[in-house]
Amino acid sequence: MLLGGCLYGFAGGGLPPSIKTVAVLPFDNQTPEPTLTQEVSVAVREAVQSRLGLREASENQADAVVRGTISRYEPDLPVAYQGNTENNQVTVSRRLVQITVSVEILDQRRGKALWSRSGLLLEGDYSPGQERDGRQKALDKLVTNIVEGAQSQW
């Protein structure tokens, strides 16, 4: 028996037929971490293009816009500890990044929100010294939330 692979993607993924292009606006960043704006915008832009099948367009030309606010960034929350009985010391073995965002996808032609979430808490755990890994996990969760939310709402 020969088994074949199957590739699939979401070409529009449940979007209204009129939504073919999107502009991802830079997210407002209310945190002290300046690089978050670009990291979030790039991750969201790539996701709406590759996973929702939309083409990028300028804000004036786009059928829809994605906009949002990054309201909180906690990069160094200890979540797991390891004890050493020889010297009675406890060390942190896992840490957590938390990012809180609000996101909206707006149909520009109709002037109405297609999907929105406020206060979305995203987390990513990491080993000490590997904060970037935790941040990437949190960004991956943001992208998944936006894509799944958008597909389920339309």
Language-model region placement:
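Surface-exposed short loop/turn segments
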Residues: 10, 50-114, 123-135, 144
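A structural "domain/chain start" motif
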Residues: 4-49, 53, 58-61, 106-109, ...
